[in-house]
Design a protein with these regions (language model features):
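Preference for bulky hydrophobic residues occupying beta-strand positions
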Residues: 46-48, 92, 123-125
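Active-site helix/loop of acyl-thioester processing domains in fatty-acid/polyketide metabolism
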Residues: 40-43, 60-85
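Non-catalytic linker/capping segments at the edges of enzyme domains
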Residues: 1-47, 51-52
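HotDog/MaoC-like acyl-thioester-processing domains
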Residues: 1-13, 98-100, 110-137
Length: 137
């Protein structure tokens, strides 16, 4: 299957199964509006603009928004492979703060298929070439 066909499947599946999703749903006027696309390696990616309205602590993206975006990326990765599923378990490790005001690349990939109904996917951020500052809270 070509990337173009897979991206069409991704969009069709997302629109049918997830139209009001706060992360990627086109029918959700209050949503974040991320547009995921399939990459050559089977992962999906989207750009997220870390606007200050998504702030948690000063100048840092809220952890709940971070988690929702990571979950949405993994879901869209499944959609790109023709799989509709829900998240049964999710673990997030916050290694360093995500600064506001910078566009970030969000990626997700299926990493394991253990059984017919059990998949593992991982998602992560790619940061601009700028070392995050440590903060004392």
């Amino acid at each position: 299957m070509t990337i173009e066909c897979a991206n069409e499947r991704l969009e069709k599946t997302r629109n049918a199964a997830h139209p009001f999703c706060v992360v990627c749903g086109k029918a959700n006027e209050c949503g974040l509006g991320l547009q995921f696309s399939l990459c050559d390696d089977g992962s999906v990616e989207a750009i997220f603009d870390c606007h200050e309205k998504f702030q948690g602590y000063r100048d840092i993206l809220h952890g709940g928004i971070t988690s929702a975006l990571l979950d949405g990326a993994m879901t869209n990765c499944l959609f790109a492979h023709g799989i509709v599923a829900v998240t049964a378990e999710m673990n997030v490790r916050f290694r360093h703060p995500i600064k506001l005001g910078l566009p970030l690349l969000l990626k997700a990939k299926i990493t394991a298929r253990k059984q017919r109904k059990k998949l593992t996917a991982k998602s992560h951020w790619l940061f601009p070439k700028q070392k995050p500052k440590r903060r004392n809270f």
